[in-house]
A protein has these predicted regions:
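Divalent metal-dependent catalytic cores for phosphoryl transfer on phosphate-bearing substrates
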Residues: 12-129
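C-terminal membrane module of polytopic membrane proteins
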Residues: 117, 135-138, 146
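All-alpha helical catalytic cores of prenyl diphosphate-utilizing isoprenoid enzymes
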Residues: 1-8, 34
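C-terminal functional modules
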Residues: 131-133
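N-terminal intrinsically disordered, cationic/polar leader segments
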Residues: 111, 128, 137-140, 151-152
Length: 152
């Protein structure tokens, strides 16, 4: 669900900001978390793999995408680097596990879409798990005291 939501946000960004390379951004959105398929083991184990512990999903994902790119004859080197950069930079900041900060417009857009979906989905889950309105208390992810609101 997260990857689909990120991709939809990126589609919107492409309409709102025509300078974005749509093919690059949509491909990056689809591939940005592909490394999680090797970072975490399957159910019922559902725990970090050795590769997941050592490398993390971002590095694993760049390696997976790089392997596929090498199988495509004549794939443009600049485009390959741009796609890999988007994946490497999708967490946006070093302190959030990003090996690189976004350096191209598509990487910025992907970071915003990923962050927006993660935070709004988390807030949605908080709201779905409470019947309270008013102040809900401090939340570390948001670094803020959250307030529950409902449609009247």
């Amino acid at each position: 669900q997260h990857t689909l939501s990120v991709t939809r946000l990126c589609e919107y960004y492409c309409k709102a900001y025509p300078l974005l390379k749509k093919d690059l951004l949509i491909t990056a959105a689809i591939c940005h978390d592909i490394g999680k398929t090797k970072e975490i083991s399957l159910f019922p184990e559902n725990d970090y793999t050795d590769d997941g512990q050592f490398l993390g999903h971002i590095v694993i994902g760049v390696e997976m995408v790089g392997e596929k790119i090498r199988q495509i004859p004549g794939f443009p080197a600049v485009l390959a680097n741009e796609l890999k950069h988007c994946i490497l930079a999708h967490h946006g900041e070093y302190e959030f596990g990003s090996p690189k900060k976004p350096a191209i417009m598509e990487a910025v857009a992907l970071n915003f879409a990923d962050n927006t979906d993660a935070k709004l989905q988390t807030f949605t889950e908080i709201m779905e798990n409470t019947t309270e309105t008013g102040w809900l208390g401090f939340n570390r992810l948001f670094d803020s005291n959250l307030k529950g609101t409902r449609m009247e």
